[in-house]
Amino acid sequence: MYCALVTATDSITTKLLNAFRPRTSAPSTATVLRSVLWPIAILSVIHRSYVLGTNGYITDDFGPVYRAVINFKLGLDIYNEQFDHVDPHYLYPPGGTLLLAPFGYLPVDASRYWYISFNVLAFLIAAYLMLRIFDYTLSSVAAPALVLAMFCTESVTNTLVFTNINGCMLLGAVLFFRWLLKGGRNAELLAGAAIGLTLVVKPSLAPLLLLPVLNRQFYTLITAFGVPLVFNIAAWPLVPDPMNFVRHTVPYIMSTRDYFNSSIVGNGIYYGLPMWLILLLRVVFLLLAVGSLWLLYRYYRERDPRFWLLTSSGVLLTASFLLLSLGQGYYSTMLFPFLMTVVLPNSVLRNWPAWLAIYGFMTMDRWLLGHWPTTGRFLEYMKITYGWSLMLVVVFCVLYFRYLDAKQDGRLDQGIDPPWMARERTPAPV
């Protein structure tokens, strides 16, 4: 044991000294990029978690969670929120309360810091698993680039600053994808368990259950529904007021609020759009999403399962954020697996309109204008909505134009990718 520790210490010392020694040959581009990106990525993770996360913000998503688990421990009412104010509310079902109950046995600050730590760890594990899904390793340039890109986004930063659970949600989604791609009964059951744990807390990833149905991976549904069912059955007699969740909280969840809501209906109500126009917009974007999903299913499900699964997930989640009653900016965290498809040669994201859309729902830039406050508020409040909307337009247009070209060339039976893409199915090594 002692020899192993000495060897490890010597190895670390040697690596540190080698970083400052003159090179005997010109470093590769990948080596230079890794040297640049890793320090920035690591410090960005530390800054977002240790500095911004612990400093917190006026928006505190953890406060209601902590009050709920403390009330659960003490046997007090949990689902007694006053929904007539705009502060964060506790909306998790009894099963989610049971899952998070251990945080109620720590002092509030310690509990919050552990909550942040678990989410940071979940983000990092999810990043590693995404690299493996796309055949990259930690020694590639893609590793620090992905970590840096994730922790520079509004969605990850606000997840940690507001102390939300989206890091664990992302990890659940990535595990779900990884096991679905692996295939087999055991992997399908594990995929269902992974997404089922997220459904115990909130239903944000529920639209993804369409994917195993379309791919005939029905074992996934057993654990996807079984895990939240078991947690809620176990929690029901332990929660003092479980029916208040049904009578009081569920109607609020199903309603539409006109603040901190980037969905079409949320921003539409905020800006006073007529309901017929809101409905028309929702129908238009629903049709775009359905068209994209059909093209993906018809031409990619069997030819390119990875591309089909992850691109379809992006369409499903983006459409749900945009079309359902509530869409918040940090929900975009769950889109990282979809955005990683940019490394694939047939990605729908290799064009500038796609990255204009991504800027809209991922940027930390604030567009509030001191001299023109009305214009500034509009730009700030609508950038996420426009980003999600443009993304659905981009995906449909890319796939539809591929379809038209393939139909014109008479090669629909070979798929809709341009012929040159057939020679570049795998991402280039980085």
Curated annotation (Swiss-Prot):
**GO process terms (BP):** capsule polysaccharide biosynthetic process; cell wall organization
Q: Which UniProt keywords apply?
A: Cell membrane, Cell wall biogenesis/degradation, Glycosyltransferase, Membrane, Transferase, Transmembrane, Transmembrane helix
Please tell me where this protein is predominantly located: membrane
Mutant phenotype after disruption: Cells lacking this gene result in colonies with a more erose appearance compared with the usual glossy appearance. The mutant yields arabinogalactan (AG) with a significant reduction in arabinofuranosyl (Araf) content concomitant with a relative increase in the amount of galactanfuranosyl (Galf). It shows only a slightly reduced growth rate.
How does the record classify its membrane topology?
A: Multi-pass membrane protein
Give the enzyme class. transferase
Organism superkingdom: Bacteria
How is this protein named in the record?
Answer: Alpha-(1->3)-arabinofuranosyltransferase
Per the UniProt record, which EC number(s) apply here?
2.4.2.47
UniProt pathway annotation: Cell wall biogenesis; cell wall polysaccharide biosynthesis
Q: Where, subcellularly, is it found?
A: Cell membrane
The record's Pfam families line, in alphabetical order, gives:
GT87
What is this protein's function per UniProt?
Involved in the biosynthesis of the arabinogalactan (AG) region of the mycolylarabinogalactan-peptidoglycan (mAGP) complex, an essential component of the mycobacterial cell wall. Catalyzes the addition of an arabinofuranosyl (Araf) residue from the sugar donor beta-D-arabinofuranosyl-1-monophosphoryldecaprenol (DPA) on the C-3 of an alpha-(1->5)-linked Araf from the arabinan backbone of AG.
This protein's GO cellular component annotations are: plasma membrane
